[in-house]
């Protein structure tokens, strides 16, 4: 796009509005190079980047980027084979640090969907080795001792020698105090010296480095430290040489990565520029517009970014509309409206946000041309007309259907009749060539052209006749009208004179009355539209607040869930530990009493997570209150899910119950009544138990074939408990022959169980030594 339009619209001043939000010199350089483009894909990419950055700020409102300096020259020096100095290495170090922080930020970013920005974040390089090398340079511009072993050795020797010098000088200060003008160690020519009285200069052997202006003090480096000082000077030279060697070595290590580091710096600057755009959006309530590829423009509440307290206006430049002609008197804001349209298009095509409301749409133009003169004096010279006409002639030779044309005070500066005719002819030529044009004029003849000509629309700037001031409101579809009579009357001109004047142009008055009615209708429509916008803004604010609250609640929910998971994991770990201890205690006892089995099972039940707190279930509490328990009622013991029967009630209100072979004492809250019509078998853990009936009474069978030893012993333990609680007299245990390990385990278990009356292998026709029949005590 031509540079002249950017100068006319003061685009550089607009770009300067974004500078305070930038953090890097790379971002600043990219902003300065920013220019409008007609490539739709690039504009869409810039718009998408801004929208994604806005979404990122919702989740990370304090997102920032480490400030960095320009390193393009540094990288070029590396590529040319030059070695870098400490200051240049610090610039590279800063860029690598900024890159690492951005990569870390992106890796930990959640709840944001990124596509365009993700491409930039993922292109950043990781240089852990180089970052380690560059740690040799601290921020004060000093090479650290750990940069090399040789440097550390040299500096240790320097430190030791300097300590010796200080010790010697301190001793001499004490010994020769009466010979010194001051009790301090001075420095001259980089050497440590004593301020000796001139009368004692021959009493202290050494090298004279200076004499005071009065001649009373001689600065002597004592002979005792001369050799040490020379040694220090030599070590300092070695130190400088070693530092140069380190700079050369690290330069060689960085050199192969110069291009990658330069690319990283550019990406950091690009992300910084996108961030600055969004900060501008937040500060100025700007928006990312929609993009129309058919030159349709719809600007809602658009403002000129450089005008303080600018009035917001709507501009609708539809696809079929060729020209908008703004008529009316000068000083009403016509030129500002013209510039606002042009500048908004330039900003959007440069990938910048615009000062307008949501729903605004911009077109794409290959070129924008303008003939805008800031001089709006009524008396314009012929030379001014010639200058403008020369410019217009040049523009007419360059514009095409892909151009936007802005013409200010078209035809001004010459005879009004001729000027109006020229203006209409130029507009007609542009209309026939289908070139989108916005033009301003104060010629009344162009009002009729706008009304009578297809694809051309009149517009004007509102004028408040009550205050005699322009309101700067853009009234599209309403031609401008003269307010001369109204203004003259309000300024005190005789009504007779005003009436006489109005009678001379009755026909024009009819037109003015029509225009006045149109203005009133437009104002009424604008008021309704403003009310609608206020409601939309309130809804938008509420929507943002609800979205923010929703995100916060989700984060809190996730935090609480994570805490709950951690607590649950701790509880499970504790439960497993306690259950292991209970099982160890059980297995360590050779004889178990019935109540110990029940207590152990109850403990294990309590370790299981409870899905429902039955004691707080109001429905169950009401159901229990319908009928009080009585002796003989069937119950379910809540602590471990076993069935039993109430046998008696104690004086303290507790109940005795028979649960299998065991008598238990229970509080009423520890059991539930089982209704006869609702009795169902209580679900227990499945352990391959198959009940059968025979003439010998109730029996059960446990099949342990194919089980691992620990699994088999665990199932056997549960099976025997259930058999005892269900008053079974006899059970069968099928363990197979195999290696005999499980069979031996079953035998040992049965031997130490005091409830087992007897056990032995089954008959040959019932499994032989592969099965064991167990009989319990009555």
UniProtKB/Swiss-Prot annotation:
SMART domains attached to this UniProt entry: MUTSac (SM00534), MUTSd (SM00533), SMR (SM00463)
All copies of domain Smr, residue ranges: 702-777
A biological process from GO: rescue of stalled ribosome
GO molecular function, one term: mismatched DNA binding
InterPro entries, sorted: DNA_mismatch_repair_MutS_C, DNA_mismatch_repair_MutS_core, DNA_mismatch_repair_MutS_sf, MSSS, MutS, MutS2, P-loop_NTPase, Smr_dom
Binding-site positions, ATP: 328-335
Keyword Nuclease found: yes
Keyword Oxidoreductase annotated: no
Keywords: ATP-binding, DNA-binding, Endonuclease, Hydrolase, Nuclease, Nucleotide-binding, RNA-binding, rRNA-binding
EC number(s) stated in the UniProt entry for this protein: 3.1.-.-, 3.6.4.-
Oligomeric form and interacting partners: Homodimer. Binds to stalled ribosomes, contacting rRNA.
Job of this protein: Endonuclease that is involved in the suppression of homologous recombination and thus may have a key role in the control of bacterial genetic diversity. Acts as a ribosome collision sensor, splitting the ribosome into its 2 subunits. Detects stalled/collided 70S ribosomes which it binds and splits by an ATP-hydrolysis driven conformational change. Acts upstream of the ribosome quality control system (RQC), a ribosome-associated complex that mediates the extraction of incompletely synthesized nascent chains from stalled ribosomes and their subsequent degradation. Probably generates substrates for RQC.
Stated family: Belongs to the DNA mismatch repair MutS family. MutS2 subfamily.
Name under which the protein is recorded: Endonuclease MutS2
Species, as recorded: Streptococcus pneumoniae (strain Taiwan19F-14)
Lineage summary: Bacteria, Bacillati, Bacillota, Bacilli, Lactobacillales
Gene: mutS2
């Amino acid at each position: 796009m031509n540079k002249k339009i950017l100068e006319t619209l003061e685009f550089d001043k607009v770009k300067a509005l974004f500078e305070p939000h930038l953090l890097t010199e790379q971002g600043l350089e990219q902003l300065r190079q920013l220019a409008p483009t007609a490539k739709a894909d690039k504009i869409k990419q810039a718009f998408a980047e801004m929208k994604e950055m806005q979404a990122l700020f919702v989740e990370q409102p304090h997102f920032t980027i480490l400030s960095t300096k320009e390193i393009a020259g540094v990288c070029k020096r590396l590529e040319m084979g030059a070695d870098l100095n400490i200051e240049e290495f610090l610039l590279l170090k800063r860029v690598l640090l900024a890159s690492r922080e951005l990569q870390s930020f992106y890796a930990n970013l959640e709840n944001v969907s990124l596509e365009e920005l993700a491409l930039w974040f993922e292109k950043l390089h990781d240089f852990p080795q180089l970052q380690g090398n560059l740690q040799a340079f601290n921020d004060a511009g000093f090479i650290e001792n750990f940069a090399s072993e040789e440097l550390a050795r040299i500096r240790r020797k320097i430190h030791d020698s300097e300590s010796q010098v200080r010790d010697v000088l301190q001793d001499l200060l004490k010994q020769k105090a009466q010979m010194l003008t001051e009790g301090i160690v001075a420095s001259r020519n980089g050497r440590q010296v004593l301020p000796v009285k001139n009368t004692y200069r021959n009493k202290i052997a050494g090298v004279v480095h200076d004499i005071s202006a009065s001649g009373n003090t001689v600065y002597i480096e004592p002979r005792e430290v001369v050799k040490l000082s020379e040694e220090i000077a030599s070590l300092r030279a070695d130190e400088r040489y070693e530092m140069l060697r380190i700079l050369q070595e690290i330069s060689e290590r960085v050199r192969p990565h110069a291009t990658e580091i330069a690319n990283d710096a550019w990406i950091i600057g690009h992300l910084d520029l996108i961030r600055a755009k969004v900060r501008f959006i937040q500060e100025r309530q700007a928006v990312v517009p929609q993009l129309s590829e058919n030159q349709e423009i719809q600007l809602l509440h658009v403002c000129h970014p450089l005008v303080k307290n600018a009035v917001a206006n709507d501009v609708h430049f539809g696809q079929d509309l060729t020209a908008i002609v703004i008529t009316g008197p000068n000083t009403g804001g016509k030129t500002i409206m013209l510039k606002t349209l042009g500048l908004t298009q330039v900003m959007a095509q440069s990938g910048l946000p615009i000062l307008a409301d949501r729903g605004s749409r911009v077109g794409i133009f290959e070129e924008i041309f303008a003939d805008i003169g800031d001089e709006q004096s009524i008396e314009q010279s012929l030379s001014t007309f010639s200058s403008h006409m020369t410019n217009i002639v040049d523009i007419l030779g360059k514009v095409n259907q892909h151009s936007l044309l802005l013409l200010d005070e078209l035809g001004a500066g010459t005879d009004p009749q001729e000027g109006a005719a020229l203006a209409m002819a130029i507009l007609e030529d542009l209309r026939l060539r289908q070139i989108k044009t916005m033009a301003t004029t104060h010629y009344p003849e162009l009002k009729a052209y706008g009304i009578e000509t297809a694809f051309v629309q009149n517009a004007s700037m509102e004028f408040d006749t009550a205050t005699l001031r322009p309101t700067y409101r853009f009234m599209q579809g309403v031609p401008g009208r003269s307010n001369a009579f109204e203004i003259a009357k309000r300024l005190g001109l005789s009504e007779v004179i005003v009436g006489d004047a109005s009678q001379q142009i009755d026909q024009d008055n009819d037109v003015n009355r029509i225009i006045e009615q149109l203005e009133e209708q437009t104002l009424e429509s604008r008021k309704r539209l403003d009310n609608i916008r206020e409601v939309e803004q309130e809804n938008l604010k509420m929507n943002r607040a609800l979205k923010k609250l929703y995100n916060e609640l989700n984060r809190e929910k996730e935090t609480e869930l994570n805490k709950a998971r951690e607590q649950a994991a701790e509880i499970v770990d504790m439960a497993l530990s306690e259950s292991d201890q209970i099982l160890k205690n059980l297995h360590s006892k050779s004889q178990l009493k019935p109540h110990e089995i029940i207590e152990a099972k109850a403990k294990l039940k309590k370790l299981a997570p409870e899905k429902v707190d039955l004691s707080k279930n109001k429905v169950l509490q009401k159901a229990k209150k319908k009928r009080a328990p009585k002796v003989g009622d069937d119950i379910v013991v809540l602590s471990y899910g076993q069935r039993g029967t109430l046998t008696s009630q104690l004086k303290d209100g507790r109940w005795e119950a028979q649960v299998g072979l065991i008598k238990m004492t229970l509080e009423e809250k520890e059991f539930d009544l089982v209704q006869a019509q609702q009795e169902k078998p209580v679900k227990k853990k499945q352990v391959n138990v198959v009940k059968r009936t025979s003439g010998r009474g109730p029996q059960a069978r446990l099949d342990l074939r194919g089980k691992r030893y620990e699994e088999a012993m665990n199932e056997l333990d549960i099976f025997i408990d259930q058999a005892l609680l269900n008053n079974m007299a006899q059970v069968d245990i099928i363990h197979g022959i195999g290696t005999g390990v499980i069979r031996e385990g079953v035998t040992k278990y049965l031997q130490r169980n005091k409830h087992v009356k007897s056990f032995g292998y089954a008959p040959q026709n019932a499994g032989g030594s592969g099965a064991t029949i167990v009989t319990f005590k009555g």
